[in-house]
């Protein structure tokens, strides 16, 4: 008779322990119920990127002096600079400039070391394509400014500022 009583007591203790664990999980769920959502509904909501965000590179053809500093400081020698030496004025003339964003690691060295500031980082981060050859941008594609998502009325922008805790 005693083994039956101890089994019944063990069963009761296990039931109480299971109910306590379920209650703890339920309390955690309820504590998260009144918080704001962490995720955003992309592409209908987009984050406003920070000021120092390193997105697609913007290139100004008229400012470039074809010095190839960007190629030398790039860790993967990515920018392709084609130029021709003009003997009458003894200067380089830029013919073609291209960057393959499928290979680019967006380190920002080319922008930082450019002596004429013809390169700059934009806030554009939507570079996905179905064909990797479309990621090879020439000077015309690099010269296009990205469309601002702030002016698009169909997209709700969300400012991503860190909360300051006191």
Curated annotation (Swiss-Prot):
It is found in: Plastid, Chloroplast thylakoid membrane. [4Fe-4S] cluster 1 binds at residues 64, 67, 70, 114. Residues 55-84, 95-124 form the 4Fe-4S ferredoxin-type domain. One of its GO terms (biological process) is photosynthesis, light reaction. GO terms for molecular function: 4 iron, 4 sulfur cluster binding; iron ion binding; NADH dehydrogenase (ubiquinone) activity; quinone binding. It is a peripheral membrane protein. InterPro entries: 4Fe4S_Fe-S-bd, 4Fe4S_Fe_S_CS, NADH_quinone_OxRdtase_chainI, NDHI. Its cofactor is [4Fe-4S] cluster. The keyword NADP applies. Pfam families: Fer4 (PF00037). Binds 2 [4Fe-4S] clusters per subunit. NDH is composed of at least 16 different subunits, 5 of which are encoded in the nucleus. NDH shuttles electrons from NAD(P)H:plastoquinone, via FMN and iron-sulfur (Fe-S) centers, to quinones in the photosynthetic chain and possibly in a chloroplast respiratory chain. The immediate electron acceptor for the enzyme in this species is believed to be plastoquinone. Couples the redox reaction to proton translocation, and thus conserves the redox energy in a proton gradient. Belongs to the complex I 23 kDa subunit family. This is NAD(P)H-quinone oxidoreductase subunit I, chloroplastic. The lineage of its organism: Eukaryota, Viridiplantae, Streptophyta, Embryophyta, Tracheophyta.
